[in-house]
Amino acid sequence: KNRITCMPKHFVAHGTPSGGLNCAQVSGGERELRSLYLYPFRRVIKETNPLALMTCYSAYDGVAITGSPYYMTDILRGELGFKGYVYSDWGSVDRLKTFHAITPETDEAGRLALEAGVDLNIDSAYDNFERMVQEGRLDIKYIDLAVRRILTVKFQLGLFDAPYGDPKAVSKVVRSAEKVALAKEIADESAILLENKNQILPLDLAKYKSIAVVGPNSNQTIYGDYAWTTRDTKEGVTLLQGLKEVLGNKVTVRHAEGCDWWSSKKDKIAEAVEAVRGSDLAIVAVGT
């Protein structure tokens, strides 16, 4: 009942891409690969026997991990002894075409990943496998192997006996009063004040008649790092909403986004500049 499997990620050498850019390649050589990047996976696989694992976006020394039989089969299964199924990261298979440029075709990117040992894919690169088998471009044995690995784990978890678990048991844990209180405590304690120059915080409202709130995150509910999927949720209070609620009519609040998260467009900047110039204080909410 209610059984799940953990999924270690991202295999492998994901944490130090060139220039700190997500997806960029990692350089290091064989010694660093084995002594540094493979070590945590080797230990976790040996000590906990995880039934699932996720690939990474990166290439190591120019070889895209997700499309490499050397990394995904020879090392992961042959050397480390991994027995579960491999799951792609979002878009990691498609990026064999769009980012790593090792093939001009999405279907071919899918074939490379499947043959390398990636059993389950998030994006659309596996959608045409039936046609590819019929055309002789893909050996069905790779599909059979992937399906066998996935179904084996599902049987081990008992998903065919109780596919939905016990909703009543889940409701006692998920969003229970105890867990909601704990989540709030964690969120409160996660806030980090890097610097409080001139002791500006907490704000002395007697000094400010107007405050500008600018930035792409100024009116978004971001509940954590990499939590972009919750940015438009109606549950929760945004920075702008919270300030307006607390300040009421005591302080004039001017708002402007100024820019988008990922864009080089400058059409919103003037509005933000105007809001800041007309205010006694600016609060800027940026970052992704």
Residue ranges and their predicted role:
Residues 1-288:
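Glycoside hydrolase catalytic-domain context in secreted enzymes
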